UniProtKB/Swiss-Prot annotation:
Native source species: Drosophila melanogaster (Fruit fly)
Name of the encoding gene: ben
Protein name as catalogued: Ubiquitin-conjugating enzyme E2 N
InterPro entries with a match to the protein in the record: UBQ-conjugat_E2_core, UBQ-conjugating_AS, UBQ-conjugating_enzyme/RWD
Family membership: Belongs to the ubiquitin-conjugating enzyme family.
Knockout or disruption consequences: Mutants in this gene exhibit several, largely neuronal defects including lesions affecting the neuronal connectivity of the giant fiber with the 'jumping muscle', and the axons of photoreceptor cells R7 and R8 fail to make the proper right-angle turn into the medulla (hence the term 'bendless').
GO BP: any one term: positive regulation of JNK cascade
Entry EC no(s): 2.3.2.23
Top-rank taxon, per record: Eukaryota
Residue stretches making up the UBC core domain: 3-149
Job of this protein: Catalyzes the covalent attachment of ubiquitin to other proteins.
One GO MF term: ubiquitin conjugating enzyme binding
Top-level enzyme category: transferase
Length: 151
């Protein structure tokens, strides 16, 4: 860990000592810039009861550039495509070095509670979300049961 910037060490320590409710982020034992993340589907959302695996990677120039984050678990969501890429302003143009790993994880958790079909990455999902929200929510619940609920 000594070759890591102090900021990454501090953020990692804080994540371990003060975990975010519903989120578990563990640094990889071979690469402290890579995190194995588990996000629990928020209550009262179509993703409730789901356990979603994500990967988070801090690029060499972090915090000048945003972390790279993607869902590994399949999810039916207008802002997350089939490859797990996430459409979230703080991961793109709204990124600021003042933000931290925990801010990003909280933003992703909030995105699960409030999908935004007006800024989609998965156009087909967003379209259904706009024209028949009830069916889209049903699909999201089905995918959650199928892909994100541990037996």
């Amino acid at each position: 860990m000594s070759s890591l910037p102090r900021r990454i060490i501090k953020e990692t320590q804080r994540l371990m000592q003060e975990p975010v409710p519903g989120i578990n982020a563990i640094p990889d034992e071979n690469n402290a810039r890579y995190f194995h993340v588990i996000v629990t589907g928020p209550n009262d959302s179509p993703f409730e009861g789901g356990v979603f695996k994500l990967e988070l990677f801090l690029p060499e120039d972090y915090p000048m550039s945003a972390p790279k984050v993607r869902f590994i678990t399949k999810i039916y969501h207008p802002n997350i495509d089939r490859l797990g890429r996430i459409c979230l302003d703080v991961l793109k143009d709204k990124w600021s070095p003042a933000l931290q790993i925990r801010t990003i994880l909280l933003s992703i958790q909030a995105l699960l509670s409030a999908p935004n079909p007006d800024d989609p990455l998965a156009n087909d999902v967003a379209e259904l979300w706009k024209v028949n929200e009830a069916e889209a929510i049903r699909n999201a619940r089905e995918w959650t049961q199928k892909y994100a609920v541990e037996d």
